[in-house]
Amino acid sequence: MKNYFKFLLMFMGLISYSQQYQWTGASGNNDFFNELNWKHTATSEIPLENTINPGQIIEFELFITCEVIADDEINLGENGKINVINGQLNGHSVTGLGQVILGDSSYFNLNGSYPIGGGVTVIFESNTSWVRLNNIEPTTAYYYYHDSFYHDNQTLSYPENLRIDNYYHNGSVIRPNILSNPLLKFFSDFNLEGEFGNISNSDLFIGESIPAYLNNDISSFILKRGHMVTFAENNDGTGNSKVFIASEEDIIVEELSNYLNNKISFIRVLPWNWVSKKGTAGDIQYMNNDWFYKWSNNGSSDLNREYAPMAWGKGAADDENDVEIIVDKYKSTHLLAFNEPDDCNGQSGQYGNMCVVDTSLTYYKNLLKSGLRMVSPACRQGAVFDWLNEFNSKAIEQNIRIDVIAVHWYDWASNPENSPNANPQDVFNRFVNYLESVHEMYGLPIWITEFNANRHRNEWVHRQFLQLALPFLEETNYIERYSFFPPTTQVANFFDSNDSFTQIGELYNEFMSTKSITETRYVSSSNLDSENYNFEQIECNPDDEFLSINSLELDEEIIIYPNPSSDYININTDEEIWKLQIIKMNGEKIDLSPSGNGIDISFLSKGIYILNFNNRIIKFVKN
């Protein structure tokens, strides 16, 4: 029954033998423009030669599963449609007057500089779908395409019910922010069996609020691509816990390890956001970066950048309101803990006894309730080897998770006051040795949230140091993010007094950054657990997705009237109704209750549907 209803509605006596073709991949390649890869949904005939060509108007309705590549312009006529369900179309651009309809697990990726023509409509049928514009940044995508996306005959609006997120440096991902198909599905038994529950939003699910009464009873799960999930053993986010990131592929875990199996009482699913390594310390515009932080929890993400909130000190972590502030952050996936709490005479450590490790750990523990990926307190340069080491050891003893290590580095150990003209290569070598030592101690990804060559060094040293450091940071796998912090002496600022780039600002701005997390599916290690999961590549077979009319078991004795209908339908039966369900084209099931006026279908979009009446299957049409 797994695939029974996928594409059911298109292939069982469609209203007419219209020009509808389904993807087969029969030619042995995945070329959209090869007619041998298509067949008619009713007759199985192949389209005529040169009827599906680049730039040529296509008036067919096409149904796609699996992965298809269109490396040139798709031109859809007024009747042209592309339906994608449980598949992926990687293309250059789509133009014309037609529609692209994205169902469950459907992804439309475009590389062109002008990827979507003004007459094209994109219809989202599911929240597990996206349009990715690889070379259009979010602000440009919003400006040109914000009115091109629909759901249930309504234009989607950013940010109310449409997300536009950055896809690394130059791209954007557009997806509906609607409650529809599950983003996370979890099961009581191994191998995706037993009782199951679904989560379709970013709310916190704790203890008895976990769907299907599966508190402490989860053994396997499916996480849809473009999302992350945090699982934890205890209701406050502590205990055995782990973050899974389904960046560009679904994560399917058929057997949770003993570390989490039947121990999950805390779940939070979040939309993933694709960022490069380079960021800024402070809300600084025009630096070609994908993320920033600002030593506080009062910032906001914008279209092109993810904001990483920081709980600077005790006042941002000591009550439930502080947690709510973090939970409500739009587009934030990580939480930075305290700023230099090791300093009893300055920064956050001077307030509320935060320089005492036990005190800081108490408030850090409260932050785990946010369900975000956790970044450690950022200590002064040397304190990462003692104060933070003690913090981490006690966190491990109390089962308090740290996912990422944050560091500050200013080359203080080299007597910088007396070496304003230090050799940049020597400065760089010390920087590398420091980071390698930190990684050797903790074995976790590193965020360098503040660094420079030291405020006592001149501009030339800073600039030469950066020219050495930036390529190293990009090439080093354990460096996940970094943000250069110009010294307070203003010797190495990004901008001059006229707000023009300095040489250092120009260098930082023009340096192209790479992906912060390169894996398409990522299991985040932490101070508590470094166990990884092996994921098998799932093979897609179009024949498994498209079912022929002969395989369907329609009930010919039950009649629906009127059919087609625009508002209500009735069933010619005296049977007691114990099951009544509409099944949409994307497989979504809608449970219904009959009324005296019949079955209300006015809320449905036009199309073909299945009615499951007491497990008897009947087709009807909404017009």
Language model regions located:
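Active-site clefts of carbohydrate-active enzymes
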Residues: 346, 376, 441-466, 485-497
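C-terminal outer-membrane/trafficking sorting elements
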Residues: 15, 546-623
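N-terminal carbohydrate-binding/catalytic regions of secreted carbohydrate-active enzymes
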Residues: 275-336, 343
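Aromatic-rich peripheral "rim/lid" segments of glycoside hydrolase catalytic domains that contact
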Residues: 308-309, 313, 468, 472-546
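Compact beta-sheet-dominated domain cores in extracellular/mature segments
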Residues: 149-277, 284-285, 299-301, 516-520
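Aromatic- and acid-rich polysaccharide-binding/catalytic face
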Residues: 294, 309, 339, 388-437, ...
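Bacterial Sec-dependent N-terminal signal peptides
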Residues: 1-20, 549, 611-613
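Extracellular beta-strand-rich, repetitive "passenger/adhesive" scaffolds
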Residues: 21-28, 40-46, 60-73, 77-179
